[in-house]
Structures are given as structure tokens and as C-alpha cells.
Swiss-Prot record:
<dbReference type="Pfam" id="PF03776">
    <property type="entry name" value="MinE"/>
</dbReference>
<dbReference type="InterPro" id="IPR005527">
    <property type="entry name" value="MinE"/>
</dbReference>
<keyword id="KW-0131">Cell cycle</keyword>
<comment type="function">
    <text>Prevents the cell division inhibition by proteins MinC and MinD at internal division sites while permitting inhibition at polar sites. This ensures cell division at the proper site by restricting the formation of a division septum at the midpoint of the long axis of the cell.</text>
</comment>
<dbReference type="GO" id="GO:0032955">
    <property type="term" value="P:regulation of division septum assembly"/>
</dbReference>
<dbReference type="InterPro" id="IPR036707">
    <property type="entry name" value="MinE_sf"/>
</dbReference>
<comment type="similarity">
    <text>Belongs to the MinE family.</text>
</comment>
<protein>
    <recommendedName>
        <fullName>Cell division topological specificity factor</fullName>
    </recommendedName>
</protein>
<dbReference type="GO" id="GO:0051301">
    <property type="term" value="P:cell division"/>
</dbReference>
<keyword id="KW-0132">Cell division</keyword>
Length: 92
């Protein structure tokens, strides 16, 4: 962040802020994740994703699926979001 950005109050992009938050959550939870127990943060993550996406697109809660699985030494966070078909543009 540059000096002028600091003075002028330029904000970070929403996507980069969300990415940083997700990385922090994953790093924190990674150390405490044991076995196949579902982490406590997944329902909150799903609700927050729903809130953010609903600002731009009309979707249902069932359209977002969040799943965490462990593969060998890796943990994979799988997020599937089903977006509606775009509305046809009006003919001129």
C-alpha cells in the first residue's frame, strides 16, 4: 500500500480481503483439524459466502456447497457455487 493510498483511504478489493480472511481461517484451523470431524467454521463460511454473493446475484442457500476433505498430507477445501443462467438481454 503506497503512502498516497493510505492518505486517500483507498480500499482493498473485496476479493483480496475475502482471500486473506480465508487463508487465515484455513491456517488456524489446519492445526486443529483431526480425523474426519467437520470444522466449526464451515457453516459460518457458507453463510458469509451466501451473503457476499447475494449482493450481486440472486441465489438460494442450496446453491452453495462447502466441503473439506483430507488427501494424504493435503487438505482440500472444495467450494461449489451454482450460479443462475444469465437473463437474456432485451432486444432493441
Amino acid at each position: 500500500m503506497s503512502f498516497f493510498s493510505f492518505l486517500l483511504g483507498e480500499k482493498k478489493k473485496t476479493a483480496s480481503v475475502a482471500k486473506e480472511r480465508l487463508q487465515i481461517i484455513l491456517a488456524h484451523e489446519r492445526s486443529s483439524l483431526s480425523g474426519k470431524k467437520r470444522p466449526d467454521y464451515l457453516p459460518d463460511l457458507q453463510r458469509e459466502l451466501m451473503a457476499v454473493i447475494s449482493k450481486y446475484v440472486k441465489i438460494n442457500a442450496d446453491d452453495i456447497k462447502v466441503h473439506l476433505e483430507k488427501q494424504d498430507d493435503l487438505e482440500v477445501l472444495d467450494i461449489k457455487i451454482e450460479l443462475p443462467d444469465p437473463a437474456p438481454s432485451p432486444a432493441r
